[in-house]
Every structure is written in structure tokens, then in C-alpha cells.
UniProtKB/Swiss-Prot annotation:
The gene is adk. Residues 122-159 are annotated as: LID. One of its GO terms (biological process) is AMP salvage. Its EC number is 2.7.4.3. Belongs to the adenylate kinase family. It is found in: Cytoplasm. It is an enzyme of class 2 (transferase). The lineage of its organism: Bacteria, Pseudomonadati, Pseudomonadota, Gammaproteobacteria, Enterobacterales. Residues 30-59 are annotated as: NMP. Coiled coil: none annotated. The modification N6-acetyllysine is found at residue 192. This is Adenylate kinase. GO terms for cellular component: cytoplasm.
Length: 214
């Protein structure tokens, strides 16, 4: 089962990716993790990636595709994989197709922008322990304080409204066109496309995914 998750940052993909991995026994392939691992391993592709990254440039689509191909040939991907953070653009999706990387399911997590802003901007973190709260959906017992230690909660830089809105604009410009792309692929019988209502509670979204994936 080869799956791509689409959806804006904060749409709940991470939570459900965890569930899919456990339920169907497939690994999550994050291009960021993959690049770091390749650089660390010192492989031929890793060296190329390191040179590009050290020069402060973006790794080319060709190189990422080559890394994806190498990664999905590994033993733990024999039953499938879950692609996270890739493809981000239509040229990347085309390159994947040309490289013969086929996908069984494309799942779109649909959540309105304002709700995403609400979800992310309301997050509060206890940095030492990694505990995460939300001012509206999962508030601490005492406002602004960690339940266990009573220490101050903070807001991550990535969770500030300006940053979130910037990431959403980027998503709509670059990644949202993939929704149309994969809808057409599904019409042509090349993959299955499903839209999931990401505004629903976690358990309901999970049940919807089970229904789609079987």
C-alpha cells in the first residue's frame, strides 16, 4: 500500500500518519529524514546532496527522486510506504511518475485556513518535556503553566501567526495544485483519490481512513 498524504501544515496529517503506519505496517518516508540519513551514510547520492546543501541551495528534484527510489527498494517498504512532504509540486509528481514510482492512494486532508491558524497559533509547549497544550482544545490546568512542573509554557517560533499564514500561502501556491493533478490521475485509473474532512475529531478521521484503505 503506497500512500501520499496531502494537506496544509496543521491539517492533522502527522497524527494520522502515525495511525496508518501502525495499522498497515508501512514506514513513513520523510524526504527531510531521508536527506539527512543519506548525507550521514556518505553514499554517492548523500555526497551530492551534502555539496548542494552546503552551498545553501535546494536539492534538485532529480536527486530527491533518486533517493526515494533507493529508499523504497529497502526491505521495510515491501508492503508499501507513506510519503510525507513529497511531492510538493507538479514537476515533482511528474518526475515520480516518470521514475516508475506508482501510488495506490492519495489522501487529501481538508481543513479551512482559519481553523488551521486557530489550531497552530493556540499551541503552547513545555520545552524541556515536549508536552504540548492548546489554549482552546487542550488547555493546561493553570493558564500558561505546565501541568506537571508548573513551569512556564512557550510558543514555538513556527507556531506564530505570521509564520503560519506565510506557510499557508506557500502551500496554496505550490502544493495545492497537486489536488487537481491527482484527481485527474484517479479519473484515469492510475491511483485512488480520497478527500478526508480534517475538521472532525481524531477518532472520526481515523475511522474514515480505515473505511477508505480497508
Amino acid at each position: 500500500m503506497r500512500i501520499i498524504l496531502l494537506g496544509a501544515p496543521g491539517a492533522g496529517k502527522g497524527t494520522q500518519a502515525q495511525f496508518i503506519m501502525e495499522k498497515y505496517g508501512i514506514p513513513q518516508i520523510s524526504t527531510g529524514d531521508m536527506l539527512r540519513a543519506a548525507v550521514k551514510s556518505g553514499s554517492e547520492l548523500g555526497k551530492q546532496a551534502k555539496d548542494i546543501m552546503d552551498a545553501g541551495k535546494l536539492v534538485t528534484d532529480e536527486l530527491v527522486i533518486a533517493l526515494v527510489k533507493e529508499r523504497i527498494a529497502q526491505e521495510d517498504c515491501r508492503y508499501g510506504f507513506l510519503l510525507d512532504g513529497f511531492p510538493r509540486t507538479i514537476p515533482q509528481a511528474d518526475a515520480m511518475k516518470e521514475a516508475g514510482i506508482n501510488v495506490d492512494y492519495v489522501l487529501e486532508f481538508d481543513v479551512p485556513d482559519e481553523l488551521i491558524v486557530d489550531r497552530i497559533v493556540g499551541r503552547r509547549v513545555h520545552a524541556p518535556s515536549g508536552r504540548v497544550y492548546h489554549v482552546k482544545f487542550n488547555p493546561p490546568k493553570v493558564e500558561g503553566k505546565d501541568d506537571v512542573t508548573g513551569e512556564e509554557l512557550t510558543t514555538r517560533k513556527d507556531d506564530q501567526e505570521e509564520t503560519v499564514r506565510k506557510r499557508l500561502v506557500e502551500y496554496h501556491q505550490m502544493t495545492a495544485p497537486l489536488i487537481g493533478y491527482y484527481s485527474k490521475e484517479a479519473e484515469a485509473g492510475n491511483t485512488k483519490y480520497a478527500k478526508v474532512d480534517g475538521t472532525k475529531p481524531v477518532a472520526e478521521v481515523r475511522a474514515a481512513l480505515e473505511k477508505i484503505l480497508g
